[in-house]
Amino acid sequence: MSEDHTKADNLSEKDPHSPERSDSSSHEDAHAREEEESSDDDGALDGKPASLIAIVMIALSLAVFLSALDTTIVTVALPAISAHFNSTAAYTWVGSAYLLANAASTPIWGKLADIFGRKPMLLLANALFMIGSLVCALSINVGMLITARAIQGAAGGGLLTLVDTIIGDLFSLRTRGTYLGMIGGVWAIACALGPIVGGAFTSSVTWRWCFYINLPIDGLAFGIIFFFLKLKTPKTPILEGFAAIDWAGSFFIIGGTLMFLFGLQYGGITFPWDSATVICLLVFGVVCIVLFGLVEWKFARFPIIPLRLFQYRNNCGALLVAFFHSFVFISAFYYLPLYFQAVKGATPILAGVYILPAVLSTGVSAAATGAFIGNTGNYLIPMYFGMSMMILGYGLLINFDAGSGWAKLIIYQLIAGIGNGPNFQAPLVALQTKIKQSDIATGTATFNFVRNIATAISVVAGQVLYQNQLKKMTSTLQQLGPAASLIAAGDAGANTQAINALPTPQRDLARSAIADALSPMWIMYTAFAAAGLFCILLVSKTELTTTHEVTEVGLEAQKKAEAERKAERQAKDLEKAQKS
C-alpha cells in the first residue's frame, strides 16, 4: 500500500548533503551556517548519558504538565472566582480564554521556531506562561484575569507544540517514539489532575494558588532548559525575521479559528444556534480558514501550514486519526465527571478522583506505546490496537446508568483509558516519517492544531446531543415539578447541587434521565472511534531510522529549503515535459 508513497518520498527528500552538490555550494552553505548558528551542538541526545536525557525530559515534561494542568485546573474554582469578582462573565471566560488562545496560537509557534530557533521560542513560551500565571494570581478585576488567562493560553499552545518539535530534533525517528509517548502520558494525566488540584487549592487555601503553583514549577523548567538543552540557535536578525513571518496567514488562521470557536462557544448557550451572531461567527470563521488556505497555497513565502504536508495519503491519514482520537478521548475527561456529579452525586473533587481509572490507564498506555515504538519501530500496531480498544471501551460506556456498580465503572474506564493512550503520539510519529526534517515544526504544529479543533468541536457536539436527548424526555421530566427546568436546560453540570438536594424519588428520576441522555452521546463517540480506525488504513508503514538527522533552523535555512523545493518542482516539471 505504501510503496508508491515511499518512492515519492525518497525522490522528494533527497539528501541535501549528497555528493551531487558542488563544492562551492557546500562552502557557501557552511559559511551561512557559521554566520547563522551559535556555538550550541546539534542537540542530538541519542547515545548521550542517561542522566542528561533524564534532566532534559523532566524539564520538557514539566512544561507540558503545566500547559495541560491549566486547561482544567480552574474548572472547580470557577464558582469561587465568579463569587470573588461578583461576575457571571468570569464563569464562562476564565476557562474559555485559555482554550481559545491555546488553539488559535498553536500554528504560529511552529513557524516562529523555524525562523528564530526552538530553544529561544520555548524559553519565550515558558516566560509568557509565568507572566500570565503571575498576573492571574494577582488579578484585581475579572478583565485583568481573563486577559492573563489568554496570555497563558497562547503560551500553553507553544509549550506542547515546541516540546513535541524539540523531541523530533533531539532523537532519531526510532527513538523519539519513546519520549513522545512519555509526553502524551504526562499531558493526559495533568488534564485529569487539574480539577483535583484546583479543588484542593480552592477549598483549603485560595483559588489564586491555582496560578501561583505554576511559578516555581515553570521556573525550574525554564532554568533546566536554559542551561541543559543544547540546540542550534540561529542568529536571525529580529526585523528580518519578523518580516519573513506569514502575517496574512497568521491573521486569517487566528481570526478564523477564534470566530469559529466563538460560534461554538456561544451556540445554544448565549445565543440560539440559528441566531445571526452564531451563524455569522461560524460562517465567517470557515471563510477565513479557506482564505488562509489560499494564502498558504499562492502567496506565503514561508507558510505557517504548508500545503505540501497534505500531498501524501499517509499524512492525511495521520491527521485524520489525530482528529478522531482527540474528538473521542476528550469526551471521557469532560463528560465522565458530569456523570459522576449528576448521576452518582459526587462532589467536583470526588468526580476527579472517580475518573482516575481512565486517567491512569491512559497515561500508562501512552507511555507503554512510546516504549513499544522505540523497541520495535512499529507505530501501526499501537494505532490499530488503540482505536480498537477505544471502540470497545466507549461502547461499554453506553451501558453506564444510574444503577451501575463500581466494578463496571472501574473496569469500563480502564478499557477506555487503555484505548486512549496509544494514539496520543503514534500518529505524530507516522506523520513525521513522511515529512522532511525541515518541516518537523510546522508539521507538529499542524498536528496539534487539528487536535485542538477536534476537542473544541467534540465538546460542543456532545453537549448538543445531550441537550436534544433531554428535550425528548419533557413528559418524563415534568414529574419533577419546578426542578424540571434545571434538567431540561441541559446544564446539569452547573446544577448538580440542586439536583442532589431533591427528595429521593425526584432525585432518582432526575439521575436516571441524565444517565439516559448521556448514552446516545457515547454511541456517537463510539462511531467516531470506528471512523478513526478506518482512517488508519491510509497510514503507510515506514521503517523508523535510528540515524539522527540534524535540523537546520533560522531564516537562511528556510531560504535554502525553499530553493531546494523550487529546484525539485522544476526538475519534476522538466521530467514531465520530456515524457510528453
Swiss-Prot record:
Membrane-topology descriptor: Multi-pass membrane protein
Pfam families given in the database record: MFS_1
UniProt-annotated location(s): Cell membrane; Vacuole membrane
Comp. bias intervals (Acidic residues): 35-44
GO molecular function: transmembrane transporter activity
Biased composition annotated in UniProt, kind: Basic and acidic residues: 1-34
Signal sequence segment: none
GO CC field: plasma membrane; vacuolar membrane
Disordered: annotated segments: 1-45, 559-580
Spans through the membrane: 49-69, 89-109, 127-147, 153-173, 181-201, 209-229, 242-262, 275-295, 318-338, 348-368, 380-400, 409-429, 444-466, 519-539
InterPro entries documented for this protein: MFS, MFS_dom, MFS_trans_sf
PROSITE patterns: MFS
Induction statement: Expression is positively regulated by the dothistromin-specific transcription factor aflR.
Gene disruption: observed consequences: Decreases the expression of ver1, pksA and vbsA, and subsequent production of dothistromin, but does not affect the resistance to the toxin.
Keywords: Cell membrane, Glycoprotein, Membrane, Transmembrane, Transmembrane helix, Transport, Vacuole
Function description: Efflux pump; part of the gene cluster that mediates the biosynthesis of dothistromin (DOTH), a polyketide toxin very similar in structure to the aflatoxin precursor, versicolorin B. One function of dotC may be to transport early-stage dothistromin biosynthetic intermediates from the cytoplasm into vacuoles, thereby affecting the rate of dothistromin production.
Family according to the record: Belongs to the major facilitator superfamily. TCR/Tet family.
Protein name: Efflux pump dotC
Native organism: Dothistroma septosporum (strain NZE10 / CBS 128990) (Red band needle blight fungus)
Record lineage: Eukaryota, Fungi, Dikarya, Ascomycota, Pezizomycotina
